[in-house]
Amino acid sequence: MEIRDNNKVNLCFAFDNLRKELSRPYGILFTNNKLFLDFVSKSIQQGFKVITVGDYVSRVLEENGIIPFLEVIDGKTKRSIPQRTIVKNKEYRVTNEAGKIRFEIFEIMENILKDRDGGVVFVNGEEDLLVIPVTLSADNGDIVIYGQPNAGAVVIIVNEMIRWRVRDILEKAVVKEC
């Protein structure tokens, strides 16, 4: 399914001025896969949703028998194209430019996360910054996972404090035409 409303304003949040701030992990950085997988498994057992942003972290979980509630991927890992083996019941397609977040993606992620089925969001462009709208839309206690290049996996446990931090980052972003 393609999610697109051509009547919407073509605006984005741009983060060029925040590259350094966004390059640090904003959650728990796991460098040990066993500890990471144990933590994720326990979160699922407690009834929380697992949401991944990035192809590599999604694939690591899948290869270890953990299927995220929602995966946000662009089909590339460090700009190379890996093979996908897991197919979900619900697939969505969005467009998002590198270093930006389209305004419409906030509403799209909120609607997808309200759905009981989750799925996979294929991003035409780049998914890295979509951690922001996903974190704002996830429920308290859900975990959002993204890769920290050459370091490990970052796990954000969603709560009001982390949402406040995300909103603070958004306030510093520059609004531009996409």
Curated annotation (Swiss-Prot):
Catalyzed reactions per annotation: 3'-dephospho-CoA + GTP = GDP + CoA + H(+)
Amino-acid positions noted as binding GTP in the UniProt annotation, renumbered to this chain: 55, 57, 74, 76, 127
EC number per UniProt: 2.7.1.237
Presence of keyword Nucleotide-binding: yes
Source organism, top-level taxon: Archaea
Keywords, in A-Z order: Coenzyme A biosynthesis, GTP-binding, Kinase, Nucleotide-binding, Transferase
Functional pathway: Cofactor biosynthesis; coenzyme A biosynthesis
Disulfide bonds, paired cysteine numbers: none
Sample GO molecular function, one term: GTP binding
GO process terms (BP): coenzyme A biosynthetic process
Annotated family: Belongs to the GTP-dependent DPCK family.
UniProt function note: Catalyzes the GTP-dependent phosphorylation of the 3'-hydroxyl group of dephosphocoenzyme A to form coenzyme A (CoA).
Protein name as annotated: GTP-dependent dephospho-CoA kinase
